[in-house]
A protein has these predicted regions:
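Helix-interface capping motifs at the ends of transmembrane segments in multi-pass membrane proteins
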Residues: 35-37, 91-98, 305
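Juxtamembrane intracellular "pre-TM" segments in multi-pass secondary transporters
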Residues: 1-10, 188-221, 406
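Alpha-helical transmembrane segments of multipass membrane proteins
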Residues: 87-91, 154-158, 294-296
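Short amphipathic helix-loop junctions that connect adjacent transmembrane helices
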Residues: 28-42, 235-250
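Hydrophobic alpha-helical transmembrane segments
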Residues: 100-107, 111, 136-189, 250-251, ...
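Juxtamembrane helix-start elements in MFS-like secondary transporters
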Residues: 40-48, 103, 248-252, 256
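C-terminal transmembrane bundle of multi-pass solute transporters/carriers
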Residues: 57-61, 68, 72-74, 78, ...
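Substrate-agnostic recognition of the 12-TM MFS/MFS-like secondary transporter fold
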Residues: 10-27, 48-64, 70-82, 102-161, ...
Length: 412
């Protein structure tokens, strides 16, 4: 039976898709407003940092609260905060009082709210589909988000060019509110009084558990390395639109759409490629193909090669993240699952935030293409860590190999 014939998964998938559309439109609008207010590469990269780094502060406590109180207690308030911040941004735009500090502050709050929603919402899929099809469900959910990544920026760029930033943000708020409606239907766990020290101990326990499990630890380090280097293509995308293409917000949205289209393509072909080799070899190849796509964009100053490089990097991005996300959800114990997913988000967005700041500084000191070249080198070097961790996994018992955990479920 098709996963989308499962009513609960269908609503889950649809709300993920629509809220993802809203999030991507917010992303495009906020980033492009920074380009118009202060177009320096460092400031454009700082927007991505403010959207990403809040995960360091909010993801793990949100995951712990989700495990203690239930997902509804986290998802609904955080999603309400997103809608409220969008409305405040709209007011400042209409009042013509929006400046760089306000924009960065709102980007930080939006990033924190999004970081709080993601672990609880993503781990919920393991409760509505059986484990044998969990990987397919995670992949299909990734297709929905990357379909949003394709359509959201294109729609955001179009509405920015035609209607302006205020109405663009209103549209994003309406789309984000859909997840709020579905989130209210989540089962509520009976409330209980929990002291802050209990939340801290819950976070500490999940970190210790993940650190002692080398499969989880290697997955976290791998995704952190990948995102630190790979975020260059997303954070500096608006500068590609203005420098290489000499265009505006609509072309920026279309370039983000190309990235999302590549991600959707990757979702459909990843099973064929992933099952042919050990997962560690598969991840190492994704690292190197991604590095190659960045290298081509660095070496060849061409519109065609840039578009192809963006498409290929989008495919690698999806294939790596969905595989590691499925690994963590199938390998981690149920009582730690939201917190393990939160730690995964911590590494993803922590890498995004630090990387965006670093590549913005590199682009400001040299050129945008130079940032792509240095990033390609670092991600190629990172592939050797994957090779090392893969060899270590092969020396472990077969039931704890990374590929077995991904394909067969938790080794418990």
């Amino acid at each position: 039976r098709s996963l989308l014939q499962n009513r609960h998964f269908c609503w889950y998938w649809l709300s993920t898709f629509l809220s993802g559309m809203g999030w991507m439109i917010q992303w495009v609008a906020i980033t492009w407003m920074m380009v118009e207010i202060d177009g320096r590469p460092e400031m454009v990269g700082l927007v991505q940092t403010c959207l990403s780094l809040p995960v360091i502060f909010f993801a793990m406590p949100a995951g712990a609260l989700s495990d203690l109180f239930g997902r509804k207690a986290v998802v609904v308030p955080a999603q309400m905060l997103i809608v409220l911040v969008v409305l405040l941004l709209v007011y400042l735009i209409i009042d013509q009082s929006l400046n760089v500090p306000w924009l960065l502050a709102f980007a930080f709050v939006l990033g924190g709210a999004r970081a709080s929603v993601s672990p609880a919402w993503q781990s919920y899929v393991s409760h509505i589909v059986p484990k044998p099809v969990l990987r397919k469900a995670v992949s299909l959910n990734s297709v929905g988000f990357n379909l949003a990544r394709t359509l959201g920026p294109a729609l955001g760029g179009l509405t920015l060019g035609v209607l302006g930033p205020a109405l663009t943000l209103v549209l994003s708020g309406l789309l984000s509110s859909f997840l709020l409606g579905v989130g209210r239907s989540l089962p509520r766990r009976r409330g209980r009084r929990v002291r802050p020290v209990q939340i801290w101990r819950s976070v500490q326990a999940s970190v210790i558990y993940s650190w002692k499990d080398h499969i989880l630890r290697d997955a976290y380090v791998t995704v952190g390395l990948f995102n630190f280097s790979g975020i260059v293509i997303i954070s500096l995308m608006p500068l590609l639109a203005t420098s290489l293409f000499d265009a505006g917000s609509m072309v920026y949205g279309l370039l983000m759409g190309v990235f999302g289209t590549g991600a959707i393509f990757g979702a459909f072909v990843q099973t064929k490629f992933a099952l042919q080799v050990d997962l560690g070899v598969y991840i190492k190849r994704l690292f190197r193909v991604f590095a190659l796509s960045l290298s081509v964009m660095f070496l060849v100053d061409s519109v065609v090669t840039t578009v192809v490089g963006i498409f290929v990097s989008g495919s690698c991005w999806l294939m790596l993240h969905s595989s590691l996300s499925a690994l963590i959800q199938t390998h981690s114990k149920e009582r730690y699952r939201s917190r393990c997913q939160a730690l995964f988000q911590f590494m993803i967005f922590g890498g995004n935030g630090i990387g965006a700041l670093v590549w913005g500084v590199v682009a400001g000191s040299f050129t945008v293409t130079a940032a792509f070249g240095v990033s390609a080198l670092t991600i190629f070097v990172g592939s050797f860590y994957v090779f090392y961790s893969t060899n270590r996994a092969r020396r472990s018992p077969p039931s704890t190999q990374i590929s077995s955990a991904l394909e067969n479920g938790s080794p418990e």
